[in-house]
């Protein structure tokens, strides 16, 4: 399940429900206050909407660049998988707003990302994913929730201070 997609009405006209579509756009975030608590809401803002055929060209792919805004959290899952949570602040081109995107690195990338510091520049390629989890409320009350995040496939670039560390070739992913 992907996050909500905001499609301008002019683009949505004459579209069939459940039709394969190809969307290019921005992955954005905003805070929504609910019951006195703030929740990070993520959505795709469509800028291009084309007919898709369900082929590999229609794959779920995202390239993000930004700055680490929280310390990375490295851990092992109950099944032994190495993961590292990252929160990446992505500035809009005009610098008037910043989107905060939760990301998850796996295995080798998780070990590498565990040493990153707040303020480090990163460029990643990955995919948008969702997961359902149980949120314990008061007493025995449990609520099912959905979390959206970027699953990192590769860390393309990492810059700490004046040192740049190129982990992969950008040309490989921007075909």
Labelled PLM ranges:
Residues 1-175:
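Single-stranded nucleic acid-binding surfaces, predominantly the OB-fold ssDNA-binding core
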